[in-house]
From Swiss-Prot:
Pathway the protein takes part in: Cofactor biosynthesis; biotin biosynthesis
Function text: Catalyzes the decarboxylative condensation of pimeloyl-[acyl-carrier protein] and L-alanine to produce 8-amino-7-oxononanoate (AON), [acyl-carrier protein], and carbon dioxide.
Cofactor: pyridoxal 5'-phosphate
Domain of life (superkingdom): Bacteria
Catalytic activity as recorded in UniProt: 6-carboxyhexanoyl-[ACP] + L-alanine + H(+) = (8S)-8-amino-7-oxononanoate + holo-[ACP] + CO2
Classification via Pfam families: Aminotran_1_2
Iron-sulfur keyword on record: no
One Gene Ontology MF term: pyridoxal phosphate binding
Originating organism: Methylobacterium radiotolerans (strain ATCC 27329 / DSM 1819 / JCM 2831 / NBRC 15690 / NCIMB 10815 / 0-1)
Protein name, as recorded: 8-amino-7-oxononanoate synthase
Binding-site residues for substrate, renumbered to this chain: 22, 29, 134, 339
Amino acid sequence: MDSLDAFATGKLDALEAGSLRRKLVPTERGSGAAAARRGRALVSFSCNDYLGLSHHPRVIAAAQAAAASHGAGAGGSRLVTGDHPYLGALEDGLARHKGAEAALVFGSGYLANLGITPALAGRGDLVLLDELSHACMWAGARLSGAQVMTFRHNDPGDLAARLAEHRPHHGRALVLTERVFSMDGDRAPLGDILGIAESYDAWTLVDDAHGIGVVEDGPRAPLEMGTLSKALGSYGGYLCASRPVVDLMTSRARSFVYTTGLPPASAAAALEALAILEAEPERRARPLALARRFTARLGLPEAESAVVPVLVGEAQAALDISAALEAAGFLVVAIRPPTVPAGTARLRVAFSAAHDEAQVDALAEAVAALTGRA
């Protein structure tokens, strides 16, 4: 057997050969859309801070006050001593915002999805998820022990066909999808999906990580999870559902039970960001408007969310364009397999209320020149 280092080196060499090796790049984020890498000042179009709230003075002040009064960390699982008052207040706010009976805060969006599905499904059950669902939805589905199947991306007809064929042979059934897909920026036909799931006696879990605060119109699912780290500018995850479901998660979602509670500063920051989000509808409308300005200038399909993919194809080509954009003063990270399917490496452009029109137009001009769309 190879030594541990030899094994790791071999794997790294293979990744390097395919332009798929990941490396950390220290990045300093400033207010607005400002960023810095390798000593170069940049305008960032790769951050998920869709409403620019992570640097909002009120959000920062709320975090500072919470840390000063309740400490830097929760100190334990929420079921032991880590259930500080900010968590309950945040859960009340999230439930109200989503029109749900209750909410539960997790340590991250990944941890939420890792815990929700296994608490609801197991052996003998069926989990159907959109083929482009986020990795954490896949992880939770596989961890559940249920039979896991996919349906074609945003295809209600294929979902119905799979449920018709497989639902009779299973106990419980869950359908998993996203309101806004993180790498393509398109939106699920939730009305159709929810109707089909209900007709086959299946529960629907929607990941709203990239929708909350930006595009939230449309029907609500019985299970809606999301993150506090994007439009809300903080860190953490949550589930909004009925009170019995939330109470079940409190006892059975292992990624909740066996994890230290979210730090007071993170919870307080998210709570303050939620208040700003609800009070400033013009802030919420801006990311989508800027995304559509960008797609119009490049002749791309009209943006459906704050996320716009510019497909390139091969991983190295995407890396090269990203590097050229950085040299021109823009931070637009290349997204490569396995995050996206092979042959679909892309620039993932994320728009924020902190951007201005001149920055968007300048990026569109640079991307057009580098991708042959000029």
